[in-house]
Amino acid sequence: MTAFVIFNPNSAGGQTGQDWREIEEALERVFPLMSFFVTAAPAQAAHMVRDALRDGHMEIIAVGGNGTINEALNGFFDRGASVCPDATFSFVHSGHDSALCRKFGLLPGWRAGIAHLRQAQVRKVDVARVSCLSESGVPVSRYFLGAASFGLSGTIARSLGTARIARFFGHRFALGWHRMAALLQWRTCRVRLIASGYDEIAGISSVKLSPFGGLLDVEVSAGETRRRVLKSMKSAGRRLRSARLTAAPTLDTSGPVAVETDGESAGVLPATFEVHAGALNLRV
């Protein structure tokens, strides 16, 4: 088989780049004919995947962390439409922990990821799209495969994306550090949520959305006070399912409400989330 591989050497604190020769040799045993692109800046992966699909490549593999995988996924779409509906996407997560891997029953780490590709099957999966605002107020849209969220989790993702602490102390330590910092700075966040048969103004700590079965699984975690935020982090919130969710902060919410997709900062509310059923061929 042939494949176009998007590779981020800086993922996993630079360990992916150090292991590149081993990764290349392991991939070649599965895909004897490959083309490679090494990312050097944010957003490059999406542009290169889009160009590769238009050039006729039918198998795209992303090797890296959450950001690389999400960027590559976004390259499959342009202006709300699929660039090449018959193309196949797969990913090799090079980190030590991944919610995306857990969703699809995969082990993190490049060795486990490539080993799984040897017997992986292609199936249609749902993706979702969020339309929101950038930090500067410009409309943006992002596709996601695993999950998106806004509120406290979005703030944590935004902080992680701009900090260098993970490179020196590891992702797990950095996540705990930024989670604590975000919680200490947390202020009441009230958001209007509109979905199928649901319209409510709620005090939230975070709202998580994941595409599954043609709908969005939505979990709303309460957060009127810091004590309630701590409690919500230890228990499941209210759940609903809808093909679409619109969220907008109320006037008494201080500061922007951050949005993240697959662990990467995407923008701020207001936002609309919608599912695209069976929109991607995923080798998993």
Could you tell me what each predicted segment is?
Residues 8, 66, 128, 156, ...:
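A residue-level signal for conserved active-site and pocket-lining positions in enzyme catalytic cores
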